[in-house]
Curated annotation (Swiss-Prot):
Gene3D superfamilies: 3.30.420.40
Binding site for glycerol: 83-84, 135, 244-245
Protein name in UniProt: Glycerol kinase
Binding, ADP: 13, 17, 266, 309, 410, 414
E.C. code: 2.7.1.30
Classification via CDD domains: FGGY_EcGK_like
A Pfam family it matches: FGGY_N
BP terms from Gene Ontology: glycerol catabolic process; glycerol metabolic process; glycerol-3-phosphate metabolic process
S-adenosyl-L-methionine listed as a keyword: no
Cellular component terms per the entry's GO annotation: cytosol
A GO MF label: ATP binding
């Protein structure tokens, strides 16, 4: 007998997670497993698709076990995933032809420059809502076709399949019966027309990608099929798909135009719901599909920062300044301010609203009085400064001041960060008590599809406990700090440009 539980698979950049939710949106169990980050060259980031699959299926089974549930009890599986990351596999063997090229990967920066120089940027933005950048999937697929032996010939014979991580997981869950994605993930590929909600033939010709490689595009909330594997999840309906940031927007109940959220993950991602209108940007954000439920497509403005919480990983694993995230928090709180130090974590370039793929990281303002605490504090504050830059750009595009910013993600547990975020923006920051909003958003989408909830309005009215951080800093002090941040930003731009 199916019970009112949703199993959400949350496949992220550094770990695979599975969360069981009940009908009230309460977490009943969580399982998580990190997987290998592969760095073959400077600026290259890869994952092993088979390891992604193995880690995801293992945590799914573990989460059910912890909740004392069997597959027959689960109403539906929901899938949310790191977006833009490109997987290409052989339909006949089911094996990837190359590692997944991760959204952070910059190997195609030169190719993207060629597209811009040839005058394609306006056309691409009009069709996709995106800027030409190696961040998005299209150029990654082109690289695989051009650089993996026999890949192009196999693709032209219809042997190869491309998908974002959701497509790969669903292919594996259904033993190759379904090759699908949803509109939110498709809109991140640089191959998808967000106005017609179809793959764009002119874009495919521009990037020389055969249409036969592409998954079928479906809505974000429907029963797509059932699990076909015998790994403990058999026969569960697969009923909701959304890219991680769109899922987070839905999980934060930002279901009305004008509402916005920011996720502090490996990167930072701010989205604002713009309703059924795809709002064009003049401030180097991107226009993206938020979700499709039934026949209604909703859109969002988005700004993406490449390095957010990952700056803490760098201090831990790269500089070895701390041994754990808890130790980082203590170090950052050991000083009252940044001591004039600014960290710009442009390790893989700068995302929105700057879009400088040749920027590189820097630390500025160091004196003999600088301590490790100041560096840690500056690293923490760098996350907030980047988010403030996104907020400014978003408000310029919409012309509407944001009344509050809803937040989630791992670093949202850091109250020092959230208070500084409110201070530097001059806007209240609101954190829900349950920060699993990405998985929750996907669970809501799946639950609507199988009838646990009737529509988004019901979900928007569900009670949410939250903590609110009001701005305390004076505007003059905030402006002075922002000025120094902007000065540091200007130093790192174009660092590696030829």
């Amino acid at each position: 007998m199916r019970l009112p539980y949703i199993l959400a698979l949350d496949q992220g950049t550094t770990s695979s997670r599975a969360i069981v939710f009940d009908q009230d949106g309460v977490v009943r169990s969580v399982a998580q497993r990190e997987f290998t980050q592969i760095f073959p060259q400077a600026g290259w980031v890869e994952h092993d698709p088979e390891e992604i699959w193995a880690s995801q299926i293992s945590v799914a089974v573990e989460a059910l076990s912890r909740a004392e549930l069997r597959s027959r009890h689960v109403a539906a599986i929901a899938i949310t995933n790191q977006r833009e990351t490109a997987v290409v596999w052989d339909r006949e063997t089911g094996r990837p032809v190359y590692n997944a090229i991760v959204w952070q990967d910059r190997r195609t920066a030169g190719f993207c420059d060629q597209l811009k120089a040839a005058g394609h940027e306006e056309f691409v933005q009009q069709r996709t809502g995106l800027l030409i950048d190696s961040y998005f999937s299209g150029s990654k697929v082109r690289w695989i076709l051009d650089n993996v032996p026999q890949a192009r010939s196999l693709a032209e014979r219809g042997r190869l399949a491309f998908g974002t991580v959701d497509s790969w997981l669903i292919w594996k869950l259904t033993s190759g019966k379904l090759h699908i994605t949803d509109v939110s993930n498709a809109s991140r590929t640089m191959l998808f027309n967000i106005h017609t909600c179809q793959w764009d033939e002119e874009l495919l010709r521009l990037l020389e990608i055969p249409a036969s490689m592409l998954p079928e595009v479906r809505s974000s909330s429907e029963v797509y099929g059932t699990v076909q594997t015998s790994l403990g999840l058999e026969s569960i309906p697969i009923a909701g798909i959304a890219g991680d940031q769109q899922a987070s927007l839905f999980g934060q109940r930002c279901t009305s135009p004008g509402m916005a959220k920011n996720t502090y993950g490996t990167g930072c991602f701010m989205l604002q719901n713009t309703g059924e209108r795809a709002v064009p940007t003049s401030n180097r954000l991107v226009t993206t599909v938020a979700w499709k439920i039934g026949d209604v497509v909703e859109y969002a403005l988005e700004g993406s920062v490449f390095i957010g919480g990952a700056v803490v990983q760098w201090l831990r694993d790269g500089l070895r300044l701390v041994r754990s995230s808890g130790e980082f928090q203590e170090l950052a709180n050991s000083v009252k301010d940044n001591g004039g130090v600014y960290v710009v974590p442009a390790f893989v370039g700068l995302g929105a609203p700057h879009w400088d793929q040749y920027a590189r990281g820097g630390i500025f303002g160091i004196t003999r009085g600088t301590t490790d605490g100041h560096v840690a504090r500056a690293a923490l504050e760098s996350i907030a400064y980047q988010v403030a830059d996104l907020l400014d750009a978003m408000q310029r595009d919409t012309g509407v001041p944001l009344p509050e910013l809803r937040v989630d993600g791992g670093a949202a547990a850091n109250e020092t960060l959230l208070q500084f975020q409110a201070d530097i923006m001059g806007v209240p920051v609101v954190r829900p008590s349950v920060t699993e909003t990405t998985a929750l958003g996907a669970a809501f989408l799946a639950g609507i599809a199988v009838g646990l909830w009737s529509d988004p309005q019901v979900i928007a009215k569900m009670p949410v406990e939250q903590k609110r951080f009001e701005p305390r800093m004076g505007s003059a002090e905030a402006l002075a700090l922002r000025h120094q941040w902007e000065k540091a930003l200007s130093r790192v731009k174009g660092w590696e440009e030829a």
